[in-house]
Design a protein with these regions (language model features):
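C-terminal catalytic "cap/lid" subdomain
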Residues: 1-113
Length: 113
């Protein structure tokens, strides 16, 4: 684990490339996905819920767009079209991210795995 913290300031790269629609349907979720796609990286999204649900049931694996308020409306279509591998985890659950990073099965939603 690095001893320093890196902060990405995406304004200039986004302004120069202008890759995303100018709409309130694009928020930090899709911006993070754009960064991951641009760098050919997988993306871990930490939210305050366990993942994306449909009819109250957690979706473990997602391969098609669904309506959700967990991520912005542009996020799922973007990551599917760009083939970004994503996992959505509950960042409020202690050790959830660490367990996932260690390869243990955890509650969450994966897209593209």
């Amino acid at each position: 684990v690095p001893e320093t913290l890196e902060v990405l300031l995406p304004y200039l790269p986004l302004r120069n490339a202008d890759p995303l629609p100018h709409t309130w349907e694009v928020t930090s979720d899709t911006i993070a996905a754009w960064v991951a796609a641009s760098l050919s990286l997988d993306l871990v999204v930490l939210k305050s819920v366990d993942g994306i649900r449909s009819g109250g049931v957690l979706i473990n694996r997602l391969s098609q767009p669904v309506e959700t308020e967990v991520v912005d409306p542009s996020f799922i279509p973007f990551v599917i079209s760009k083939k970004v591998r994503v996992v959505i985890l509950n960042g409020r659950v202690p050790d959830r991210l660490e367990s996932w990073l260690q390869g243990h099965p955890v509650t969450g939603t994966t897209i593209g795995f």
